[in-house]
Amino acid sequence: MTKLNAQVKGSLNITTPGIQIWRIEAMQMVPVPSSTFGSFFDGDCYVVLAIHKTSSTLSYDIHYWIGQDSSQDEQGAAAIYTTQMDDYLKGRAVQHREVQGNESETFRSYFKQGLVIRKGGVASGMKHVETNSCDVQRLLHVKGKRNVLAGEVEMSWKSFNRGDVFLLDLGKLIIQWNGPESNRMERLRGMALAKEIRDQERGGRTYVGVVDGEKEGDSPQLMAIMNHVLGPRKELKAAISDSVVEPAAKAALKLYHVSDSEGKLVVREVATRPLTQDLLKHEDCYILDQGGLKIFVWKGKNANAQERSGAMSQALNFIKAKQYPPSTQVEVQNDGAESPIFQQLFQKWTVPNRTSGLGKTHTVGSVAKVEQVKFDALTMHVQPQVAAQQKMVDDGSGEVQVWRIEDLELVPVESKWLGHFYGGDCYLLLYTYLIGEKQHYLLYIWQGSQASQDEIAASAYQAVLLDQKYNDEPVQIRVTMGKEPPHLMSIFKGRMVVYQGGTSRKNNLEPVPSTRLFQVRGTNADNTKAFEVTARATSLNSNDVFILKTPSCCYLWCGKGCSGDEREMAKMVADTISRTEKQVVVEGQEPANFWMALGGKAPYANTKRLQEENQVITPRLFECSNQTGRFLATEIFDFNQDDLEEEDVFLLDVWDQVFFWIGKHANEEEKKAAATTVQEYLKTHPGNRDLETPIIVVKQGHEPPTFTGWFLAWDPFKWSNTKSYDDLKAELGNSGDWSQIADEVMSPKVDVFTANTSLSSGPLPTFPLEQLVNKSVEDLPEGVDPSRKEEHLSTEDFTRALGMTPAAFSALPRWKQQNIKKEKGLF
């Protein structure tokens, strides 16, 4: 049984955020130098430890990566070391199995400049790249718009296609060729990788040139080099579309109970989507199958040792039984240390006795009583992380204008109706606040539950017009009735009233109910609202205060579980609802007229409201696209401001509200489809999300602190001096004298392997096989080039000695040719 040796334990840093990498060499873990992080050999296996800082704690991910040409023994050792490292971390890590070519986005995200897969491995003498070494000849196929994966391919035009980016790496020169159908982001990622190779692997001693496939005529010297090295070019292959995963597949969840009775894996289906946390019992192990795309194994803290230690094996056996591809991703989750990705596959994930620090949306029936803190706008912008958690840009004391949708147009709401929201109406509310001398805007779009579809559509349309009037600066916040965020409530200072239906417009012919019942929630002027409920005794709740308005009087009913602050706020909002004298009624001492107004006594909720466990919320960022006619969201892990690209739109999900960020160069269709895109995201979310979750539309350059607070070290000036693609291209290759470099590369004196390199090229004399095999330089016949022994063989002897024809041998990568020559005694 392999074990973490003392050297590994001694060098293992488990307190500093970042990554550490080991390669499996002779069944031992050997550290990989940090200067070569992101470079992997396909003949090897690796173990990667990633440490993340989350608030005041650290979280751990352990990945073992399997190269396609690695041995079974190496794969087994990597898996065992991963389990043992998790044990060393006391079960606090999430384990991941990564297979070459099907790496998880989490794994790729660690290597911001790109993941490079090289041919060879430790068994063939391949070492991780040494800085300043220019003895390299390879062609890298660069894939990916976000997290780049670059793999070595045959050095020939046959490897190219019109849609991707390729790096021809000749040691002292790197030529980046951009397919004519590749996009700007793919080209920029390729340039970043080329720059990384130049600066990190070559110590800055390599020239980099860029060729745009649609304008090859602009780079004649670079094209001459490429044609010399790669041979004559035929018609290029068409672009290869990136594989996409349908949202429906991600949402196809099945939970299985796993037991290992009598040495046999027994799997029993427990549930399908929607999944709830209470399905997971601490005494058991489970497999969660996400549509065959990824397999999660959950290990209960009280499960038996054999089942816990065999979790990864159970997953691999499950994959075989289901006939899923061997490259299927696997994550092993420890009870109590689950990853955010795993948690959000469930409808709700809570952790007892943990404070999340996130305010909750106030809704009828289930409302978290969160104490709001009063902040001014300047403080919120200086401390955006507080603004993000409290969902407050300021204390609500800015200027406000309110319009109602009437006949599909905007009509200002009279001052006496400010703070009154009717379920039959839609409203636009423009809030203006100052940071220094600069004005900032929030545009709330409030949509009543009984408003017509035409009015709802008109509210969205009018919001666009109002947004344009203010130069696209307002942050748009869509609010469905009952989901009012804290900041909206703070604007009305404890006097916000939401009616079930009806309207406040003039000439309204609908009869106004003579008796109305309102449930009041809130503890101060910044978080209180009264929400109309059905005027029946069954609507009461012992934990709250209710206002009962009748033709003759107004009752203030105080449940036994309400607080003094709640009673005081109810008195304040009651003055907004009724000007008559308020009669305070204590639960259990109601007069007969009170019950008569409600249609008689009836049972109602009177059990003590339990202390709500705080839901674990981890913000998640997604790049969104609907260009293919269907919605696609690609998650960005360990995100920061640099991940927000000007050409794209992004979705920031903080669970009880969703931000939609629009880059200034995003296409118009994606801008228009903001609300639809977020709705589609919520519909296809595996956790069965609330479709009425507030949606906040944010434009680049006008981000509120409630958005920027989710990003570490947000720079408001980041986009003020951005360079164009042409500027970056010129900057990358502005030091190259291409004429001189072309002469050097194409000179016969320079040993550059090309697609036309022939084993029979040059006037080399032929010798019998026995005079060349296993001979030292001193024992070779006169006239033999020691570095090209195989080229002195006849075609027949060559095929017999090396097991292949000269043409087949010449098509192999250089490293593989060298290995074969060593094996056959011709090195």
Curated annotation (Swiss-Prot):
<dbReference type="GO" id="GO:0060327">
    <property type="term" value="P:cytoplasmic actin-based contraction involved in cell motility"/>
</dbReference>
<keyword id="KW-0966">Cell projection</keyword>
<dbReference type="GO" id="GO:0005902">
    <property type="term" value="C:microvillus"/>
</dbReference>
<feature type="modified residue" description="Phosphoserine">
    <location>
        <position position="776"/>
    </location>
</feature>
<dbReference type="GO" id="GO:0030175">
    <property type="term" value="C:filopodium"/>
</dbReference>
<feature type="repeat" description="Gelsolin-like 2">
    <location>
        <begin position="148"/>
        <end position="188"/>
    </location>
</feature>
<dbReference type="GO" id="GO:0030041">
    <property type="term" value="P:actin filament polymerization"/>
</dbReference>
<dbReference type="GO" id="GO:0032233">
    <property type="term" value="P:positive regulation of actin filament bundle assembly"/>
</dbReference>
<dbReference type="GO" id="GO:0035727">
    <property type="term" value="F:lysophosphatidic acid binding"/>
</dbReference>
<keyword id="KW-0117">Actin capping</keyword>
<keyword id="KW-0479">Metal-binding</keyword>
<dbReference type="InterPro" id="IPR007122">
    <property type="entry name" value="Villin/Gelsolin"/>
</dbReference>
<keyword id="KW-0206">Cytoskeleton</keyword>
<feature type="repeat" description="Gelsolin-like 6">
    <location>
        <begin position="631"/>
        <end position="672"/>
    </location>
</feature>
<dbReference type="GO" id="GO:0008360">
    <property type="term" value="P:regulation of cell shape"/>
</dbReference>
<dbReference type="GO" id="GO:2000394">
    <property type="term" value="P:positive regulation of lamellipodium morphogenesis"/>
</dbReference>
<feature type="domain" description="HP">
    <location>
        <begin position="761"/>
        <end position="827"/>
    </location>
</feature>
<keyword id="KW-0106">Calcium</keyword>
<dbReference type="GO" id="GO:0051125">
    <property type="term" value="P:regulation of actin nucleation"/>
</dbReference>
<dbReference type="GO" id="GO:1903078">
    <property type="term" value="P:positive regulation of protein localization to plasma membrane"/>
</dbReference>
<dbReference type="GO" id="GO:0061041">
    <property type="term" value="P:regulation of wound healing"/>
</dbReference>
<dbReference type="GO" id="GO:0005509">
    <property type="term" value="F:calcium ion binding"/>
</dbReference>
<feature type="repeat" description="Gelsolin-like 1">
    <location>
        <begin position="27"/>
        <end position="76"/>
    </location>
</feature>
<dbReference type="GO" id="GO:0051016">
    <property type="term" value="P:barbed-end actin filament capping"/>
</dbReference>
<feature type="region of interest" description="LPA/PIP2-binding site 1">
    <location>
        <begin position="112"/>
        <end position="119"/>
    </location>
</feature>
<dbReference type="GO" id="GO:0040018">
    <property type="term" value="P:positive regulation of multicellular organism growth"/>
</dbReference>
<dbReference type="GO" id="GO:0030027">
    <property type="term" value="C:lamellipodium"/>
</dbReference>
<dbReference type="GO" id="GO:0030335">
    <property type="term" value="P:positive regulation of cell migration"/>
</dbReference>
<keyword id="KW-0597">Phosphoprotein</keyword>
<feature type="repeat" description="Gelsolin-like 5">
    <location>
        <begin position="528"/>
        <end position="568"/>
    </location>
</feature>
<comment type="function">
    <text>Epithelial cell-specific Ca(2+)-regulated actin-modifying protein that modulates the reorganization of microvillar actin filaments. Plays a role in the actin nucleation, actin filament bundle assembly, actin filament capping and severing. Binds phosphatidylinositol 4,5-bisphosphate (PIP2) and lysophosphatidic acid (LPA); binds LPA with higher affinity than PIP2. Binding to LPA increases its phosphorylation by SRC and inhibits all actin-modifying activities. Binding to PIP2 inhibits actin-capping and -severing activities but enhances actin-bundling activity.</text>
</comment>
<dbReference type="GO" id="GO:0035729">
    <property type="term" value="P:cellular response to hepatocyte growth factor stimulus"/>
</dbReference>
<keyword id="KW-0677">Repeat</keyword>
<dbReference type="GO" id="GO:0051015">
    <property type="term" value="F:actin filament binding"/>
</dbReference>
<dbReference type="GO" id="GO:0030042">
    <property type="term" value="P:actin filament depolymerization"/>
</dbReference>
<dbReference type="GO" id="GO:0030855">
    <property type="term" value="P:epithelial cell differentiation"/>
</dbReference>
<dbReference type="InterPro" id="IPR007123">
    <property type="entry name" value="Gelsolin-like_dom"/>
</dbReference>
<dbReference type="GO" id="GO:0071364">
    <property type="term" value="P:cellular response to epidermal growth factor stimulus"/>
</dbReference>
<feature type="region of interest" description="Core">
    <location>
        <begin position="1"/>
        <end position="734"/>
    </location>
</feature>
<dbReference type="InterPro" id="IPR029006">
    <property type="entry name" value="ADF-H/Gelsolin-like_dom_sf"/>
</dbReference>
<dbReference type="GO" id="GO:2000392">
    <property type="term" value="P:regulation of lamellipodium morphogenesis"/>
</dbReference>
<dbReference type="Pfam" id="PF00626">
    <property type="entry name" value="Gelsolin"/>
</dbReference>
